[in-house]
From Swiss-Prot:
This is ATP-dependent RNA helicase A protein. It comes from Xenopus laevis. Keywords: Activator, ATP-binding, Cytoplasm, Cytoskeleton, DNA replication, DNA-binding, Helicase, Hydrolase, Manganese, Metal-binding, mRNA processing, mRNA splicing, mRNA transport, Nucleotide-binding, Nucleus, Repeat, RNA-binding, RNA-mediated gene silencing, Transcription, Transcription regulation, Transcription termination, Translation regulation, Transport. Residues 1152-1262 are annotated as: RGG. The gene is dhx9. The keyword Cytoplasm applies.
């Protein structure tokens, strides 16, 4: 094979082409590999190869490209030196047996009566396999997509028009021609009059009455463009929703050059004004500042001569990334069929062992012999009999015929029909029987981790194998990969998207399950696959969905065939709220008359309560009880009554209870456990949530002994993703939690909303697996009739920054162009905002290609601004803390609190920093210490401090993953070592963490007025969220040391509240949390609403420090290793930022005058000198990466331990020298790595164990 490179070169020479090879280092520091990509002009394919040396990597990439040229008919396989056989064509269908199964039942008899009248019948079957093969090479256009050429032609002109002003309801109006909520609707009406057309708003609503959101949607045909544009926006009332929808339409018309920019004066609603804040800097600090700026060679803006003509202090970018070559065409993710010497699951060539040299024929023969021997096992024969009883078995021949003849097939199957576990096995077994095993590798995506793992384990069981043979899984934090040939990988969509960077190489079939869920990752994957199918028609894509309308998917994929699989095993009878009340004779407990905070409720605009509507068929007691129940709340007592009623039926079977979120699951679990009836041994109550550990999740599948009732309390995770076989009863709250994000005001609305009719149908389908089932919907029939058919797809209600980065990382062309091909494209204004944000962060260069910074951000599974915050944290050697804070944003708070406000036990974790983020950091560090004493010590600590252990463990996993990605990107391990922070005394490292946090959460800045009241951007009113450590217990009027705070999210319920708050100094805002800084000579104006009374030159120097730091970020992301030896000028600049970050520099003392909420004494410090030579705890003096730990001083870098030498060396994973800054001196003790402990081994989780191979290597992805 050594001459394959020369062969390709000679072939290119004849065509006057040149192959271009690009080699880069890959892998981690323990096992260096090289990746080579080869491109040839005129071919939309990238040949890829990797190996432990550059020469073999080049050879492997050349061979991959030659294989591609053979597949597309550019050369013959017999011309190629030692090239393996190509894919064959035939798949023989298998004959199938048909069996009957039960059908639906009649009217709503109560279960105790319907049990006496059980019956079963046959359900009809039908299929639709008509398929019109498209012209796959023709790049078929999806008509919903936008034509963006006019927009991109105008890019530079729009950039010039963009303003940096920050408004409360329109933070980014300047980006969109200055069209705002106030002026857009009038302009849209003018457009309608001129065009003699009319757009109609279609309204829908989500959420219960007390927290309702309205959605306004409009589809408008634009004659000038010859196409439709769509907007879908939400607001707290119809008027606001319609205004937001009109704004989206007008902004899209502007970007498509149909209407002009707004030329009038933008009216700003006057918010409440913020008093100027006096800042006096120490003269010594002023001298240091001036000296630093002088050494950096930065020229400062002169003071204004006229206060009415303020000058900008923003210096812009001092250093730019060099623009990379603009991508000339829309890329397609490369695909190749399974080949010899290639492992698709690790995306690497097989350099060692027999598989490195075996041909496909040899591999196929060996696997067939093994398979034929295996199926003779009596246990396997019994499993085969069970598999044949599944409804999908009757459709095997039809499915295989469609898969063979069509690149795309949709399989629509009822819950529990067996499609998820059986279809991949049908395909694989067909290939094995036909001597083509080595030509088959199947990837199956699932929307959630639990489903990917549980389905993989089920399939492995059915095949009589250990997981990791023909079947494996890969989810975030954990992978068990299957063999390289004739195998199935079950993974989350996020994991597959991460793998796409290496292409879909060596995979014959992609199965996307649960396409109806419409999460943003699945929608993204469908666009990728649609393009891949057109470029490579040989690939096979199977889309699987529940029994919902799939016509949109069918149309999107070129009118592909749909196979409908019927057969819910047993019928399910459903009941509504009035039925449940009548059959249980339920009487609600007296309403809690405790008055709610008026500011929390924000008014009493109650809508119709459907619980007041009850049919005449029901008795007066039922109607009275129903009217006393509020639709706002989930009736836990009624669920309890239903469980007791179910017990009287004496029909064995598990009960699955659907609840909208973890808080209610926890509340319901505690409610039942406190009741002696349910707390006894006759009940087994199990929570099921995506955030609990997998070992806990697995328990829901385990059978229980006779006489015990299993009750599973679950979110919608159990709706479609997993099947629990013994469920007979479903109790459905009919609600779910969704996150609605509005970009123009940076507002997040976490709403518990009514689920859709489709959701309810899926939930009902979870019952009736082992016998006729029962479903109790806790909504009235009147409410059911009002439910939406489907919920809004996630792509319409989430920021697009992360998706945009993925598009650029995968080289798929322009962000807007790619997203316009989505099954339901997001509005153009949302796309432009994502692009603008990424350019502002320096993630995209002037050609809209990824910068080195953008490439790192694209690989971090975190919001891009937080990713950049972590990178700056590495520059200051506080990377670990910022990785912890970023990881914590992915999960709920770890605090368990029955009341709305946090208790003292939780508030104490914030020390005197007035910070939810510091509290999180302190909790995490205290837990990290406690768990070193073993699982019992960890459990005791969490129970004593009322913390959710599962959340803390997941945060640890996420933090380690983020740190691994940064280390793989080249950042020194020393800048990511654990540190101990002092939250009650001076700690300059903690000051820096808070400064960088202000950068990470910008533009979320607020000013404390009184009690719970705060002002956000432009002086708009909001409240401190009740879950904050800063939320007062009563009406006492607190004065914080600084009135300025930054916060993680703005939440809208009936009032707007700020969640995740941290107190900052005005200098930290000036340095990191302001976009527009203006000086009028007397005051410094931050983002047009905060006024600081400070000298012009001092503020200009501080603003210049940020520009200098941004310039350093450019250099560091090009070559992260330079952090080990920074030049003195940058060292001085970083030390100056450390000084500015100190609260005392701004004249702020962290000790409050009055006793803070009566917190009592702070908890005792955990001992720090407990780590040396502790073999029993699995830590000690050895470091995780053989890297020196050292410690860092408060002001200066300090010194680091010898790299790789002897003596006490800290570990990157485990902590290094965990010094504790107190008044300028280092205290504390050594804290070693986790090498021998290996993470959570005693909990069955494994760990990274000091290097990336500790648990199967770094698995890079979601």
């Amino acid at each position: 094979m050594a001459d394959i490179k020369n062969f390709l070169y000679a072939w290119c020479g004849k065509k006057k082409l040149t192959p271009n090879y690009e080699i880069r280092a890959a892998g981690n520091k323990n096992r260096q590999k090289f990746m080579c990509e080869v491109r040839i002009d005129g071919f939309n394919y990238i040949g890829m190869g990797n190996s432990t040396n550059k020469k073999d990597a080049q050879t492997n990439s050349a061979r991959d490209f030659v294989n591609y040229l053979v597949r597309v008919g550019e050369m013959r396989s017999d011309e190629v030196p030692s090239l393996g056989a190509e894919l064959g064509d035939s798949i023989d269908g298998a004959s199938l047996k048909s069996e009957g199964f039960s059908g639906p039942t009649g009217g709503p008899l109560p279960p105790h009566l319907s049990l006496q009248a059980e019956s079963s019948g046959a359900a009809p079957m039908r299929s639709n396999t008509g398929f019109n093969p498209p012209a796959y090479g023709g790049g078929a256009q999806w008509e919903r997509g936008a034509n963006l050429k006019d927009y991109y032609a105008k890019r530079e002109e729009q950039e010039a028009q963009a303003t940096l002003e920050s408004e409360e309801v329109d933070l980014n109006a300047g980006l969109h021609g200055n069209w705002t909520l106030e002026n857009a609707k009038a302009r849209l009406n003018q457009f309608f009059q001129k065009e003699k057309t009319q757009g109609e708003y279609k309204y829908s609503q989500v959420g219960p009455d007390h927290n309702r959101s309205f959605i306004a949607e409009m589809t408008l045909y634009v004659k000038q463009l010859g196409r439709k544009i769509i907007a879908r926006e939400h607001g707290s009332n119809k008027k606001l929703a319609a205004q937001s929808c009109a704004l989206s339409i007008v902004r899209q018309l502007y970007h498509l050059s149909v209407i002009e920019p707004y030329s009038g004066l933008t009216k700003k609603k006057e918010g409440e004004s913020v008093e100027p804040y006096q800042v006096n800097l120490n003269p010594d600090i002023v001298k240091q500042l001036q000296s630093t700026i002088q050494e950096l060679g930065i020229e400062l803006p002169y003071p204004p001569e006229d206060p009415s003509q303020p000058v900008s202090l923003n210096l812009g970018k001092l250093v730019h990334f060099e623009p990379s070559q603009k991508q000339s065409h829309s890329g397609v993710v490369p695909w190749s069929p399974p080949q010899e010497n290639w492992n698709p699951w690790t995306s690497s060539n097989i350099d060692e062992g027999p598989l490195a040299f075996a041909t496909q024929e040899q591999i196929s023969l060996e696997l067939k012999n093994e398979h034929m021997y295996h199926i003779q096992d009596p246990n396997i024969k019994q499993v085969l009999i069970d598999r044949e009883s599944l409804p999908v078995k009757k459709f095997e021949e039809e499915i295989m015929h469609a898969v063979h003849n069509s690149p795309v097939v949709i399989i629509r199957g009822a819950t529990g029909c067996g499609k998820t576990t059986q279809v991949p096995q049908y395909i694989l077994d067909e290939y094995i029987r036909n001597d083509r095993a080595a030509q088959c590798n199947i990837v199956v995506t699932q929307p959630r981790r639990i489903s990917a793992v549980s389905v993989a384990e089920r399939v492995a069981f059915e095949r009589g194998e250990e997981i990791g043979k023909s079947c494996g899984y890969s989810v975030r934090f954990e992978s068990v990969l299957p063999r390289p040939h004739a195998s199935m990988l079950f993974c989350t969509v996020g994991v597959l998207l991460r793998k796409l960077e290496s292409g879909i190489r060596g995979i014959s079939h992609v199965i996307v399950d649960e396409i109806h869920e419409r999460d943003i990752n699945t929608d993204f994957l469908l666009v990728v696959l649609r393009d891949v199918i057109q470029a490579f028609p040989e690939i096979r894509v199977i889309l699987m969905s529940a029994t919902i309308d799939t016509s949109m998917f069918c149309e999107y994929f070129f009118n592909c065939p749909i196979i409908e699989v019927f057969g819910r095993t047993f019928p399910v009878q459903e009941y509504y709220l009035e039925d449940c009340i009548q059959m249980t004779q339920f009487i609600p407990p007296p309403r809690d008359k405790k008055k709610k905070d008026k500011d929390e409720e924000g008014g009493d605009d109650e809508e119709t309560n459907c619980n007041l509507v009850c049919g005449d068929d029901y008795g007066p007691e039922t109607r009275r009880s129903m009217s006393q129940l509020s639709e706002k709340e989930t009736p836990l007592e009624l669920i309890e009554a239903l469980l007791k009623y179910i017990e009287t039926l004496n029909v064995p079977g598990a009960v699955l209870v659907f609840l909208p979120g973890w808080n209610l699951i926890y509340a319901m679990q505690k409610h039942l456990e406190m009741n002696p009836h349910f707390g006894s041994h006759s009940y087994c109550i199990l929570p099921l949530h995506s955030q609990i550990p997998r070992d806990e999740q697995r328990k829901v599948f385990d059978p229980v002994p006779d006489g015990i009732i299993k009750v599973i309390l679950s979110t919608n995770i159990a709706e479609t993703s997993i099947t629990i076989n013994d469920v007979v009863y479903v109790i459905d709250s009919c609600k779910q939690k969704v996150k609605l994000f509005t970009s123009h005001n940076n507002m997040t609305n976490y709403a518990t909303v009514w689920a859709s009719k489709t959701n309810l149908e899926q939930r009902k389908g979870r019952a009736g697996r082992v016998r006729p089932g029962f479903c109790f919907h806790l909504c009235s029939k009147a409410r059911f009739d009002k439910l939406e058919t489907h919920l809004t797809p996630e792509i319409f209600r989430t920021p697009l920054h992360e998706v945009a980065l993925s598009i650029k990382l995968l080289r798929l062309g322009g962000i807007g162009h790619f997203l316009s091909k989505a099954i339901e494209p997001p509005p153009l204004d949302a796309v432009i905002e994502a692009e603008h944000t990424l350019r502002e962060l320096d993630a995209l260069d002037s050609n809209d290609e990824l910068t080195p910074l953008g490439r790192i951000l694209a690989k971090l599974p975190i919001e891009p601004r937080l990713g950049k915050m972590m990178i700056i944290g590495c520059i200051f050697y506080v990377g670990d803390a910022l990785c912890t804070i970023s990881a914590a944003t992915c999960f709920p708070e770890p605090f368990i609190s029955e009341g709305r406000r946090l208790g003292y036990v939780h508030r104490n974790f914030a020390g005197n920093r007035f910070s939810d983020h510091v509290a999180l950091l302190s909790v995490f560090q205290a837990w990290d210490d406690a768990r070193m004493g073993g699982e019992d010590a960890e459990t005791r600590f969490c129970e004593h401090k009322r913390l959710n252990m599962a959340t803390l463990r997941m945060t640890w996993e996420a933090k380690v993953q983020l740190k691994d990605i940064l280390v793989n990107a080249g950042f020194p391990e020393e800048c990511l070592m654990n540190q101990v922070f002092n939250n009650t005394g001076p700690d300059n490292n903690l000051d820096v963490v808070i400064s960088l946090l202000a950068f990470g959460v910008y533009p979320n800045v607020c000013y404390h007025k009184e009690k719970r009241k705060i002002l956000t951007t432009e002086g708009r009113n909001a409240l401190i969220h009740k879950s904050s450590v800063n939320c007062p217990f009563s009406n006492q009027d607190l004065k914080y040391p600084s009135p300025f705070f930054v916060f993680s999210e703005k939440i809208r319920t009936r009032a707007i509240s700020a969640k995740g708050m941290t107190m900052v100094s005005p200098l930290q805002l000036l340095l990191f949390a302001s976009k527009k800084v203006m000086s009028d000579g007397e005051f410094i104006h931050l983002d047009d609403w905060i006024k600081l009374s400070m000298a012009h030159e001092e503020s200009a120097c501080i603003t210049a420090l940020r520009a200098a730091l941004e310039a350093l970020v450019v250099e560091v992301t090009k070559e992260p290793e330079i952090l080990s030896q920074l030049d003195p000028v940058n060292e001085k600049m970083l030390n100056m930022i450390r000084v500015i970050s100190k609260p005392s520099t701004a004249g702020i003392s962290l000790v409050m005058g009055n006793s803070r909420f009566g917190d009592g004494p702070r908890p005792p410090k955990m001992a720090r000198f407990d780590s040396g030579f502790q073999g029993n705890r699995g830590r000690g003096y050895h470091g995780g990466y053989n890297s020196g730990g050292g410690f860092r001083g408060a002001g200066n870098r300090g010194f680091r331990g010898s790299r790789g030498g002897s003596g006490p060396r800290g570990g990157y994973q485990g902590g290094g020298f965990r010094g504790n800054y107190r008044g300028g001196n280092q205290g504390g003790g050594f804290r070693g790595g986790y090498q021998s402990q290996g993470g959570y081994q005693s909990q069955g989780g494994g760990g990274y164990g000091g290097n990336f191979q500790g648990r199967g290597g770094f698995r890079g992805g979601f």
